[in-house]
Design a protein with these regions (language model features):
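Short, low-complexity, Pro/Ser/Thr/Gly-rich segments in the mature regions of secreted, periplasmic
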Residues: 68, 165-180
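N-terminal low-complexity, Pro/Thr/Ser-rich intrinsically disordered segments
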Residues: 27-60
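C-terminal motif of bacterial Sec signal peptides marking the signal peptidase cleavage site
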Residues: 17-20
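Long, charged/polar, surface-exposed segments that mediate recognition or autoinhibition
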Residues: 85-147
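Positively charged n-region of N-terminal signal peptides that target proteins for export
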Residues: 1-5
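Sec-dependent N-terminal signal peptides
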Residues: 6-13
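Bacterial signal peptide processing site
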Residues: 22-24
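Short, exposed beta-strand-loop hairpins at the edges of beta-sheets
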Residues: 149-171
Length: 180
């Protein structure tokens, strides 16, 4: 009888502990819900805003970026951010020039792990068009690589959306020289 009572007590205690774990997992990390929702609502304005900024000034953008170096650590490339744009997970690569100033941004919307649908391409075309206010130029399919691309020439930057099989990226580059 004592053995049965002890077993039931241990099972009940274990069940209560497990219930406490699931409750703890469901709780917030201490960040207010409004702030969590706000941080997940990054847009193209946030990514384009990286251009021309010093690396030190954008280190904490999008919740913090990881330094990106060449394999031999001889050249600093820029930063990699794992974040969300418009609530969708993306990887943002910010590329620095020699002065550690952000020269270009590449947003990997998909990385080949999932199928790219026509709807997803259209959604991003609409987002870029709405953000830039520029007309989209269909660049067609490259004969060499098979990449399909679309381009927007905005006042200060140009935006190129590229699709290669199941990889969809958006590059943002400053308009310089003849492009300006």
């Amino acid at each position: 009888m004592k053995k049965t009572l002890l077993t039931i007590s241990v099972l009940a205690l274990s069940a209560f502990m497990l219930m406490g774990c699931t409750t703890a997992g469901a709780e917030s990390d201490g960040t207010p819900e409004a702030e969590q929702a706000e941080t997940a609502q990054y847009t193209l304005a946030d990514t384009a805003g990286l251009l021309g900024k010093a690396d030190a000034d954008v280190a904490d953008a999008f919740g913090g970026g990881e330094e990106n170096w060449t394999a031999d650590k001889s050249t600093y490339i820029g930063r990699i951010y794992q974040t969300e744009l418009y609530g969708d997970p993306v990887t943002v690569y910010a590329v620095c020039g020699e002065e550690k100033v952000m020269d270009a941004v590449s947003i990997w919307i998909t990385d080949g792990e999932q199928e790219v649908t026509d709807e997803l391409v259209q959604t991003w075309q609409d987002r870029v068009t709405a953000f830039t206010g520029a007309e989209m130029e269909d660049r067609g399919v490259s004969g060499e690589s098979g990449t399909q691309s679309w381009r927007w020439n905005a006042e200060d930057n140009f935006y190129t959306l590229r699709l290669l099989e199941d990889i969809l990226t958006l590059d943002i580059n400053p308009a310089v020289g003849e492009l300006k």
